[in-house]
Regions:
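Active-site cofactor/substrate anionic-group-binding motifs, chiefly glycine-
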Residues: 76, 80-110
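N-terminal short beta-loop-beta anion/metal-coordinating cradle
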Residues: 48-89
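Short beta-strand segments
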Residues: 70-72, 94, 124-128, 207-212
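Gly/Ser/Thr-rich loops at beta-strand to alpha-helix junctions
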Residues: 74-76, 128-133
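Divalent-metal-activated hydrolytic enzyme cores
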Residues: 30-65, 97-121, 132-250
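Hydrophobic alpha-helical signal peptides and transmembrane signal-/tail-anchor segments
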Residues: 1-11
Length: 250
């Protein structure tokens, strides 16, 4: 009986050792990656303090950004980095395919806070070429929950499919990326938040940009809206410009 008991204890200890070793082998690479982020943060903080000893003290007092950025969640489109801005200079909201949907309380709460509390002067809606969300909306695969979100882009595809369908797939995606930005500028301009802000004379402008991951350049789609009347004009002008593109009318 004693021998049997010792065998059980030995087997349990061996199993525990193997399990712990296996766990360590699995977790160690993950923790190494995570710890790299912490080390990077320490290095960044140290260098910034060396360049500007009072930076974090000033930053901790308040934020007063002049810009709100509504962009795509894509990791290749880092808003502050590609605009050359520092912490505290850009208020940021990101979602898949940079959509402004009137039922999205998350986005609208960000916009309201930015406009009414921070009093930003500029709201930039920025898409990017080769957007995976736009491409998925075109190809219409079954992705799960996100399919409901992509319906907003799919509606734009149906709206302009007669012309966009003439383009090769890559250009079709990029053109729809541009159309999507213009439509989101229009959506935001028609929100009660922006309508109220313009009505009370607040100086806040909406811009539509597209970022090129291939070259790192931001492109202004020239649909900047400063009030409701300008919004309607710029929307019509912007869509007409895109649909009159030589690629669409060879």
């Amino acid at each position: 009986m004693l021998v049997g008991f010792l065998l059980v204890v030995f087997n349990y200890a061996a199993l525990a050792y193997i399990t712990a070793t296996h766990f360590e082998l699995l977790v160690a690479p993950i923790m190494k990656d995570i710890n790299t982020l912490i080390r990077n943060n320490r290095r960044w903080s140290r260098l910034l303090k060396e360049e500007d000893p009072g930076f974090f003290e000033r930053l901790s007092l308040a934020q007063k950004p002049r810009f709100l950025w509504i962009g795509c969640s894509d990791s290749r489109v880092p808003a502050e980095r590609l605009t050359g801005l520092e912490p505290g200079e850009l208020f940021v909201h990101r979602n898949v395919a940079n959509l402004v949907v009137h039922t999205d309380l998350n986005c609208l709460s960000v916009v309201q806070y930015a406009v009414e509390v921070l009093e930003v002067e500029h709201i930039i809606i920025c898409g990017h070429y080769g957007c995976g969300g736009v491409q998925a909306a075109l190809e219409n695969p079954e992705l799960g929950l996100i399919d409901n979100w992509l319906l907003h882009i799919r509606d734009l595809w149906y709206k302009h499919s007669a012309l966009l369908g003439e383009l090769p797939p890559e250009k079709r995606v990029d053109k729809l990326c541009e159309i999507n930005v213009i439509e989101q500028v229009y959506n935001l301009g028609h929100s009660t938040i922006m309508q109220s802000a313009w009505k009370r004379g607040q100086n806040v402008n909406i811009h539509g940009w597209v970022y090129g991951i291939q070259d790192g350049y931001l492109r202004d789609l020239e649909v900047t809206a400063t009030n409701r009347e300008i919004l309607e004009q710029r929307y019509r002008h912007g869509i007409a410009n895109l649909l009159n593109d030589p690629d669409l009318n060879p």
